[in-house]
Curated annotation (Swiss-Prot):
It comes from Escherichia coli (strain K12). Keywords: Cytolysis, Host cell lysis by virus, Viral release from host cell. The keyword Kinase does not apply. One of its GO terms (biological process) is symbiont-mediated killing of host cell. Pfam families: Phage_holin_2_1. This is Prophage lysis protein S homolog EssQ.
Length: 71
């Protein structure tokens, strides 16, 4: 049998997850489909920019390594 400590921890985590899920659903109900479309477009632009900046960072790093090796 599990100790009481582990049981109460599981119940607390389950209650917390249920509460978070409830409030997430409440928030989702307040956003209209057109707002979701705008959120999707803006999110795509942000992730595209982050991808570009990450690629730029590693290209600069690669160029510096090549310059240090004399290539």
């Amino acid at each position: 049998m599990k100790s009481m400590d582990k049981l109460t921890t599981g119940v607390a985590y389950g209650t917390s997850a249920g509460n978070a899920g409830f409030w997430a659903l409440q928030l989702l109900d307040k956003v209209t489909p057109s707002q979701w479309a705008a959120i999707g477009v803006l999110g795509s632009l942000v992730f595209g920019l982050l991808t570009y900046l990450t690629n730029l960072y590693f290209k600069i790093k690669e160029d510096r390594r090549k310059a240090a090796r004399g290539e």
